[in-house]
């Protein structure tokens, strides 16, 4: 009879422990019920990116002096800079500048180390295409300013997402 009583007490302790674990899980579930949703409905709602967001690179052709610092600091030697040396004035003249965003890792080194600030990061992050060759941007495509999300009246912009408290 004694082992039967201990088994019954063990069963009672296990039942209480299981109820406690279920209760803890239920409390955690209920604590998440009053939080705001973290996800957004993407094509119809867009987030306003932060000030230091690393999006598509914007290039200003007139400011570039063809020094190739951007190529030297790039971890994958990505920017292609074509220039011609003008012998009469002993300066380089930029002919072509291109970046392939299919390969770019958006590290921002080229923007940071450019001595003339002809490169800058934009807030544009929608670069997807059906053909990878369309991601190779020349100086004309790089010089195009992105359309602002705030100006598009068909898209609801979300300024702040609720922060997750840990």
Swiss-Prot record:
GO molecular function: 4 iron, 4 sulfur cluster binding; iron ion binding; NADH dehydrogenase (ubiquinone) activity; quinone binding
Domain 4Fe-4S ferredoxin-type: residue ranges: 55-84, 95-124
Binding annotation for [4Fe-4S] cluster 1: 64, 67, 70, 114
One Pfam short name: Fer4
Annotated [4Fe-4S] cluster 2 binding sites: 74, 104, 107, 110
Major location (coarse): plastid
UniProt entry keywords in alphabetical sequence: 4Fe-4S, Chloroplast, Iron, Iron-sulfur, Membrane, Metal-binding, NAD, NADP, Plastid, Plastoquinone, Quinone, Repeat, Thylakoid, Translocase
GO cellular component, one term: chloroplast thylakoid membrane
Listed NCBIfam families: ndhI, NuoI, PRK05888.1-3
Family: Belongs to the complex I 23 kDa subunit family.
The protein, known as: NAD(P)H-quinone oxidoreductase subunit I, chloroplastic
Biological source species: Calea megacephala
